[in-house]
């Protein structure tokens, strides 16, 4: 439920229950207002449910900081550092984090190690490492989304939650994203895709749920 600042509350999710195994990819679709974004925020610990609990490997979510990564619907909200390089390193845990989300701090690293992390992450999502010195606002919407994903993958999470991951991507970028995610899934990464439609993600996901008025079926 949401607290409206009144004696009344607005129920958003109702008896939602799901299990995501290691190496499994699940797709949840739903119309606007169905509770998709609320679900993603509950699963990452950004919202605390009024009833029920979220666990990872039997541990409560509040003890799993750094194990779950969220790719937000609007990538620009995740990119709040002055350059592509600093944003990727911050998302990977090597630098102060600004904005929403919890990232496990991994300590200081050398310039060379930072360059290696950034180069590998950018190449993984099909971006030229030469873009690392660019300001975020110099990028296209599709490039921003790929930079955000690069940083999340560089943090090596156990679970990756993607909220409308195909927004702003052309066909070639979509195909690349699916290929990258499928490779990580085969390596054991659990992936939850939340979207208003299939967006081609049905080729990646082996399970499909539908969220309607807060009920998952």
Model regions: which residues?
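Conserved ABC transporter NBD signature motif
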Residues: 52-65
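Helix-to-loop junction immediately C-terminal to a conserved catalytic motif
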Residues: 44
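Catalytic Walker B motif of ABC-type/P-loop ATPase nucleotide-binding domains
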Residues: 160-163
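Conserved ABC ATPase signature
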Residues: 135-139
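Conserved ABC ATPase "signature" region
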Residues: 112-130
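A short, flexible loop at the N-terminus of ABC-type nucleotide-binding domains that lies
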Residues: 1-15
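ABC ATPase C-loop
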Residues: 152-153
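H-loop/switch region of ABC-family ATPase nucleotide-binding domains
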Residues: 195-196
């Amino acid at each position: 439920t949401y607290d409206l600042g009144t004696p009344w509350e607005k129920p958003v999710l109702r008896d939602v229950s799901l299990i995501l195994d290691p190496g499994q990819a699940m797709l949840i679709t739903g119309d606007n207002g169905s509770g998709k974004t609320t679900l993603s925020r509950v699963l990452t610990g950004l919202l605390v449910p009024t009833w029920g609990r979220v666990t990872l490997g039997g541990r409560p979510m509040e003890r799993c900081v750094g194990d779950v990564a969220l790719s937000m619907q609007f990538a620009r909200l995740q990119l709040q550092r002055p350059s592509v390089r600093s944003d990727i390193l911050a998302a990977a845990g090597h630098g102060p984090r600004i904005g929403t989300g919890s990232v496990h701090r991994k300590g200081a690293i050398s310039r060379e190690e930072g360059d290696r992390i950034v180069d590998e992450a950018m190449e993984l999502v099909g971006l030229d490492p030469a873009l690392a010195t660019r300001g975020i606002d110099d990028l296209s919407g599709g490039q921003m989304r790929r930079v955000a994903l690069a940083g999340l993958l560089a943090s090596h999470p156990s679970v990756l939650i993607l909220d409308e991951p195909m927004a702003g991507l052309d066909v070639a970028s979509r195909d690349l994203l699916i290929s990258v995610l499928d490779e990580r899934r085969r390596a054991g990464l659990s992936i939850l895709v939340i979207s208003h439609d299939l967006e081609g993600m049905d080729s990646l996901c082996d399970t499909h749920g539908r969220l309607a008025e807060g009920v998952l079926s």
